Regions:
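Short hydrophobic membrane-inserting helices
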Residues: 1-73, 77
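N-terminal leader/targeting and pre-domain segments
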Residues: 92-94, 103-110, 115-121, 125-128, ...
C-alpha cells in the first residue's frame, strides 16, 4: 500500500531524528547493556570457570571491554565530525577560491592593456599561472570538463592578445637591424625608441607561445619496435584560435600535441615556422596563411587539415607528414621548393589549381584519392615511386619542366586529359591498374612510356606528341586508343639495347576492335601497323610491336 503523506512525514521525521542522535543512542545502549552484563552476569554464573577466577575479575573484564568499545566509538565519531567540519569548511572556502581567481583574472586583463611592457608581462604570467591552477584544482572543482572550461576562458584571452595588431609589425625587417636604415621615418632617435618597443612586444608574445608550447606535450613514449608516441601535455585539450595573427617573430610548435581545434587561418608567419613532429588530433586550419620564411611541417600528424589558399614564399617541408583525413591544398602557392617526400595521404588530397614555382617533390608519397586538376608546376615535378590507391586526377595540369612519374603504381583511374608537358615527361615502368586517359594531352618534348603496363583501357586520343614518343617494352592488355593523335616525330614501339630488342606488347586476349591506331590525318607521322594472327583471330598492331599472353609473363 502506498504510504500516506502523513505517514511519509512521520517517517522522514523519524529518519531525521535518528540521523542526528544515532551515535548517542548507540553509546547509551552499549553502556546500559554492558553495565547490566557486568553486574548481572556474575549472579548467573554459579562458579568460576577455573581455579583462581572470581566474580570481581569477570566483572572487571566486562567493564574494561565496554570501556574500550566506547573509547573506539568516541574516537571514530570525533574523526567523522572533523571530516564533516573540514568538508563544510572546504565547501564554504570554494566560492572564495573561485572568486579570488576571477578577481586575479580581471586584474591580469587590465595589466594586458597597460602601456608598459613589464606590466603587461606580469599580466601574462598571472594568466598562465591561473590556467595551471584551474587544471590542477580537483579539490574545489572535481569535474574535469569544468576545469577545462575555466582554463579555456583564459586561453582565449591569451590567444586574443597574440591576435591583436601591433603597429610596428610591418617594420619587422627594419627594426631587426642593428642600426637605423637610411631615411628611417623619424630619424635615428625614433628608430631607437621603436626598436626598444618592438623588442619588448616580441619578447612578451614569445613568452606566451613558449608557455603554450611547453604545456603541449609530456614527452614521448618509445615502443618496443622503436617507434615513438608523442604524449599530450596539460594544455593539449584546449582550442587555439590564432586566426589572422601577424607572427612577426619565429613560431615554434615542434613536438606539440594539439588535442582540440587549431585555427591559423589567415595568419602571417614573417619568420621561420616550425611544426615538425607535431600532432593535430582535430582540424588544423591553415587556410589563407602566409609563410614568408622557411616552413618546417615535416613528420607532422594531421587529422583534418586545410591549407587552401596558403602561400609559401620560402621552402615548404612536408616530408613524412601524415594526413589521416581529407587535406585541402587547393590554390596553394609554393614559391620555393615544396617537398612531400614519403608523405602519406590516407583520404582525399586536394591540390586543385595549386601553383609550384620551383621544384615539387612527391617521391614515394602515398595517395588515396589525389586531385591535381589545373595544378601548375613551373619547375621539375617528381612523383617517382609514389602510389595512388584510388583516383589520380591531373586533368588540365601544366608541367613547365621535367615531369617524373617513373615506377609509380596507379591502383585506380588515372586522368591526364588536357595536361601540358613542356619538357620531358617520363612514365617509364609505371603500372596503370585501371583505366588511364591522356586525351588531348600535349607533350612538347620527349614522352617516355617505356616499360609501362596498361592493365585496362589506355586512351591517347587527340594527344599531341611534338618530340619522341617511346612505347617500347610497354604492355597493353585492353583497349588502346590513339584516335586523332598527332606525332611530330616517329613513335617508338621497339628499342634495342646491347643487342637485345624490347618491343611493345599487345594482348591477344583483347578484342581486336579495341585497338585503334588511326591517328590524325594531319599527323606528320603515322603509327605504322601490321596484321598478326592468333588462333585464327586477326589483330592490327604497331609494326614494331608483338602480341603476347598477359597470363604468361615469361612469354
Amino acid at each position: 500500500m502506498a504510504e500516506t503523506p502523513k505517514n511519509s512525514e512521520t517517517s522522514k521525521g523519524t529518519r531525521s531524528w535518528w540521523s542526528k542522535n544515532w551515535f548517542y543512542t548507540v553509546l547509551i545502549a552499549i553502556a546500559l547493556i554492558d553495565g547490566l552484563s557486568a553486574f548481572g552476569l556474575p549472579l548467573i554464573v554459579s562458579q568460576p570457570y577455573s581455579a583462581g577466577d572470581s566474580i570481581s575479575t569477570l566483572r572487571q573484564a566486562i567493564l574494561a571491554a565496554t570501556g574500550g568499545v566506547l573509547a573506539i566509538l568516541t574516537l571514530w565519531e570525533s574523526r567523522r565530525k572533523n571530516i564533516q567540519e573540514k568538508e563544510k569548511n572546504d565547501q564554504d572556502h570554494t566560492p572564495q577560491v573561485h572568486a579570488e581567481r576571477r578577481a586575479r583574472y580581471a586584474k591580469a586583463l587590465e595589466q594586458l592593456a597597460d602601456a608598459k611592457a613589464p606590466v603587461r608581462l606580469g599580466g601574462v604570467y598571472t594568466l598562465i599561472k591561473l590556467v595551471d591552477e584551474w587544471l590542477a584544482d580537483e579539490k574545489t572543482l572535481p569535474n574535469e570538463e569544468e576545469r577545462r572550461e575555466e582554463g579555456q576562458v583564459i586561453i582565449n584571452s591569451l590567444c586574443a592578445y597574440i591576435r591583436s595588431p601591433f603597429d610596428l609589425a610591418s617594420k619587422t625587417e627594419e627594426l631587426s637591424e642593428h642600426k637605423a636604415p637610411e631615411n628611417y621615418e623619424g630619424g635615428n632617435q625614433q628608430f631607437i625608441k621603436d626598436q626598444a618597443r618592438f623588442r619588448e612586444e616580441k619578447e612578451l608574445r614569445l613568452t606566451i607561445l613558449e608557455a603554450v608550447r611547453n604545456r603541449l606535450n609530456k614527452g614521448t613514449r618509445v615502443h618496443k619496435n622503436g617507434t615513438q608516441k608523442l604524449l599530450p601535455g596539460q594544455w593539449s585539450g584546449f582550442d587555439y584560435d590564432f586566426s589572422n595573427t601577424v607572427f612577426f617573430y619565429p613560431v615554434g610548435f615542434n613536438n606539440s600535441y594539439f588535442g582540440a581545434s587549431s585555427n591559423f587561418s589567415g595568419a602571417e608567419f614573417t619568420e621561420n615556422t616550425n611544426f615538425s613532429k607535431a600532432k593535430f588530433v582535430e582540424k588544423a586550419d591553415f587556410s589563407r596563411a602566409k609563410f614568408a620564411k622557411k616552413a618546417d611541417i615535416s613528420r607532422v600528424k594531421f587529422t583534418d587539415a586545410d591549407f587552401s589558399g596558403a602561400e609559401f614564399t620560402e621552402k615548404a617541408d612536408f616530408c613524412w607528414a601524415k594526413f589521416a583525413e581529407d587535406v585541402d591544398f587547393s590554390r596553394v602557392k609554393f614559391t620555393k621548393n615544396a617537398n612531400f617526400y614519403e608523405a602519406k595521404f590516407t583520404k582525399d588530397a586536394k591540390f586543385y589549381r595549386a601553383e609550384f614555382t620551383e621544384k615539387a617533390g612527391f617521391t614515394r608519397a602515398k595517395f588515396t584519392d589525389a586531385d591535381f586538376t589545373g595544378a601548375k608546376f613551373a619547375e621539375d615535378a617528381n612523383f617517382s615511386w609514389a602510389k595512388f590507391a584510388e583516383k589520380a586526377d591531373f586533368c588540365w595540369a601544366e608541367f613547365a619542366e621535367k615531369a617524373d612519374f617513373t615506377w609509380i603504381k596507379f591502383a585506380d583511374y588515372a586522368q591526364f586529359g588536357w595536361a601540358k608537358f613542356t619538357e620531358d615527361a617520363n612514365f617509364s615502368a609505371v603500372k596503370f591498374t585501371k583505366d588511364v586517359e591522356f586525351s588531348a594531352a600535349k607533350f612538347a618534348k620527349n614522352a617516355s612510356f617505356s616499360g609501362a603496363k596498361f592493365t585496362k583501357n589506355a586512351k591517347f586520343s587527340w594527344a599531341k606528341f611534338t618530340k619522341g614518343a617511346d612505347f617500347s617494352w610497354a604492355e597493353f592488355i585492353r583497349n588502346t586508343d590513339f584516335f586523332e593523335a598527332t606525332f611530330e616525330e616517329k613513335p617508338i614501339f621497339e628499342y634495342e639495347l646491347y643487342s637485345e630488342i624490347f618491343k611493345a606488347k599487345f594482348s591477344h586476349r583483347a578484342n581486336p576492335e579495341d585497338y585503334n591506331f588511326k591517328v590524325s590525318h594531319n599527323s606528320p607521322y603515322k603509327i605504322e601497323t601490321k596484321e598478326q594472327e592468333h588462333n585464327g583471330i586477326k589483330f592490327v598492331i604497331p609494326k614494331d610491336a608483338e602480341l603476347f599472353d598477359p597470363d604468361e609473363p615469361s612469354e
